[in-house]
Amino acid sequence: MATLATIDLRSDTVTRPTAAMRAAMAEAPVGDDQYGEDPTSNLLQARCAELLGKEGALWLPSGTMANQVALRVLTRPGDEVIVSRECHAGWHETGGSAANAGVQLIEVGDRGVFTAAEFEAAIKTRAMPVYAPSTLVEIENTHNRSGGIVFPQDEVVRICALARKRGLASFLDGARLWNASVASGRSEADLAAPFDLVAVSFSKGLGAPGGSVLAGSKELIVAATRHRRMLGGAMRQVGILAAAAIFGLDHHRERLAEDHAHARLLAETLAGSPAVRLDLSSVQTNIVVFHLAAGAPDAGALVARARERGVLLNAFGVRTVRAVTHLDVTREQTERAATVLRELLD
């Protein structure tokens, strides 16, 4: 008897390049990117600068490196960075913010979001020499560990205006900014406008095998180029990967709404179980983070049992589980995954 294909909801990073994306990669004209001679990389950088409303952009091999380069460009060792609670830079980059940039992160807010008032309260006074100077505010949009929540743009504008007034730089970790744009109906340029530097990723919802871009002023991009080299991220014929990113921008950006609908379907099914605690208002894009009630299996047990039934998930804590919809998961597969999880929980 034929077995059903595995449904991988661990992350949107598990997507595989489509046949058409692979063809675009194979046909991409390339050159030495460190000499500025890779035409496909140059095209991607120019396009992203325009999409994000910035003067320039720089390709990097990963979102983590983009974040780390941004920290090095916008801070000095010993500085303090104000971030959202459970941000990627603090929870998923193996201490890189301390090791690479020499900064400490101060988490504020709740569920991936904070207010301008909370931000201002976290800024250390420079009159006290015992404090690390607050020099940067970082916002993650959408916010991974908070279930793909979209940071309210009105609050973003207030926070970044206050940062400028108080002499702090601003950075947007927009690894999933494409999702935020689709969910909010705002352009990427609008979402990125208040920030000094912006990072976006191509290896998640857009389905490319790797790559991110930093965008900002020409001066900041020159500095980022130096730090990219310092961290080992400067590559040669990167047009092969840049072509995948361009293909994703052309063909996979608008369809992100399908992923969002699939996540909503999954969340609504799970929310009907007494074993699940899930605030449906938090399910705004393609990530579903749910909590297991007392008496239900713990996260590790549920993940193991789901795997036996062909559904892959991630445990995000003792009683917290994450599921992520993406390019490689159909509506039918989402429905099957939801059915499997309800059977395991009820």
Give residue spans per PLM region.
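Conserved PLP-enzyme active-site core in the AAT-like
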Residues: 2-309, 313-329, 333-345
